[in-house]
Amino acid sequence: MARTSFQGEIPKEQIGVCPVTDAQNVIAGKWKIIILWHLKETKRFGELQRLVPGISKGILTSQLRELEKDQMVIREVYPEVPPKVEYSLTEAGKGFMPILESMGEWGKKYAINSKKSY
């Protein structure tokens, strides 16, 4: 079965039905989890793009906008020339970090069982 990626608004009837579904709707997408992981510390756009190999500028922009809309990320623009924009986690984003850390630990255990190494 082919994998698909959700694009667009989440149907209203799916919101609030299951807290796991609600969480999944926020972090769904190929890149969001790794973007959140790298935002443990405040980063500029170019730094994020370097840290996430294979992501295009447009996709990174769109994923950051979605994370900002879902109140996981704050975009701060400084009135400087050249323009300076930084991204950081909101309290909700910071609250997700223990889950990401647990996922990382699970990934390490899975890698050992699968004979992979990091």
Named regions from a protein language model:
Residues 79-103:
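Basic, amphipathic "hinge/linker" alpha-helix immediately C-terminal to the N-terminal HTH DNA-binding motif
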Residues 71:
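Glycine-centered, phosphate/nucleic-acid-interacting loop/turn motifs that mediate DNA/RNA or nucleotide
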Residues 14-59, 83-86, 117:
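N-terminal helix-turn-helix DNA-binding core of bacterial DNA-binding proteins
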Residues 2-8, 15, 37, 94-118:
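Amphipathic alpha-helical dimerization/coiled-coil segments
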